[in-house]
Amino acid sequence: MKLLIDAGNSRVKWALYQGEDCVRQGAAEHGELAGLAAVWRDLPLTGAWMSSVARREVADALAAAVPCPLHRVHAERRFGDVRNHYRNTAEQGADRWLAVLAARELCRGDVIVACAGTALTVEALTAEGDYLGGLILPGHGLMLQSLAQGTANLNRPAGEVVDFPQGTQDALASGAIAALAGAIAEQRRRLAERTGRAPATVILTGGDAARIAPWLAAPMQIVDNLVLMGLLKVANT
């Protein structure tokens, strides 16, 4: 069996695969990693594959908890028919690359891949397999947190998302969603301009995917655990 680990900025997701079948999965906050070694210790593992954008001490703790050979996955210049045009793949988060590889399996046309977690990443992938790069911006929670910490009067709960906010709490909620949905829409527009084709499908993943989806006027799929899907693709080669 193969253990796949996606170590994000705030949480760790993992899944156990027998062939193409997911037989077990779980998640933990960074402060809850101690229990994972006990969970994984008795599993009949043949190997483990990890993508990490977490702090080094988190990645090291996960590596120590894995009771079998561990493969740390990084972004590459090419995988299959996907070509990575990132200037320096060594500085690119593996999670972004793996999400693109998974999206390629789901959609063979032009696609925008949006991962909505602690940060929002918005990637552009053409039907020809050219991964053009993408955006990184603060996620929903981080955006509101930065306003609370960086201003004198905005440390308050966000309200409702409305078209024309007439109160500060609604303005916070609406502004955050407008920024996130707007970034996705703008990359979709840019990709259509680049290719000369119809605007792309959006594949949306991450903890805030459902929060953003209602505000996107685009054909879309919400896909859970997209990074783990990409890890499985790499592990099976």
Curated annotation (Swiss-Prot):
Pfam families: Pan_kinase. A monovalent cation. Ammonium or potassium. Its cofactor is NH4(+); K(+). It catalyses: (R)-pantothenate + ATP = (R)-4'-phosphopantothenate + ADP + H(+). It is an enzyme of class 2 (transferase). It is found in: Cytoplasm. Substrate binds at residues 86, 93-96, 168. Its EC number is 2.7.1.33. CDD domains: ASKHA_NBD_PanK-III. It comes from the Bacteria. One of its GO terms (biological process) is coenzyme A biosynthetic process. GO terms for cellular component: cytoplasm. Catalyzes the phosphorylation of pantothenate (Pan), the first step in CoA biosynthesis. Belongs to the type III pantothenate kinase family. Homodimer. This is Type III pantothenate kinase. It comes from Chromobacterium violaceum (strain ATCC 12472 / DSM 30191 / JCM 1249 / CCUG 213 / NBRC 12614 / NCIMB 9131 / NCTC 9757 / MK).
